[in-house]
Amino acid sequence: MKLALVAVGQRLPAWAETACEDYLKRFPADWRVELKAVKAEPRTQGKTVDAMKAAEAQRIEAACARGVRRVVLDERGTRLTTQQLAQRLQAWQLDGRDVALLIGGPDGLADTLKDGADETLRLSDLTLPHAFARVLLAEALYRAWSVNAGHPYHRE
């Protein structure tokens, strides 16, 4: 199974890049985990929010492999504990389909992506800056993997 974090926005503060890369590198070699950053639509006059989200949605779709399980990150998604995320990660692995976890841009994700998602999860009840969302997702996935692997990173 391949696990892709597909996020709108290519520039992050150095600390966020470093943290996200660190968590993704911690996965064992047989886990194919990657970050795919897609270009945010420029916020210029004359463009509606829906038009900008639609342009970003096209870039997200292009970054996702065909037949991939699409998991949208949204504040209205399902709330999971670490143990529940570990169970979900294990179920995805057993299913065998590649998984793309989608993080929207400043205005969120287009409704077409939300409506077409296989699942919608939330990272927090709070609205998070994109840099935090990427780091938090990478850490949460690594922690979930560690639970399933019996690795000492996670402690109850």
From Swiss-Prot:
Q: What is its EC number?
A: 2.1.1.177
This protein's GO cellular component annotations are: cytoplasm
Q: Where in the cell is it found?
A: Cytoplasm
Leader sequence residues: none
Q: What Pfam family does this protein match (any one)? A: SPOUT_MTase
UniProt keyword annotation of Cell wall biogenesis/degradation present: no
Q: What keywords would UniProt list here?
A: Cytoplasm, Methyltransferase, rRNA processing, S-adenosyl-L-methionine, Transferase
Reactions listed under catalytic activity: pseudouridine(1915) in 23S rRNA + S-adenosyl-L-methionine = N(3)-methylpseudouridine(1915) in 23S rRNA + S-adenosyl-L-homocysteine + H(+)
How the protein assembles, per its UniProt entry? Homodimer.
Q: Which HAMAP family match?
A: 23SrRNA_methyltr_H
> Can you tell me which family this protein belongs to?
Belongs to the RNA methyltransferase RlmH family.
This chain's protein is named: Ribosomal RNA large subunit methyltransferase H
Source organism of the structure: Methylibium petroleiphilum (strain ATCC BAA-1232 / LMG 22953 / PM1)
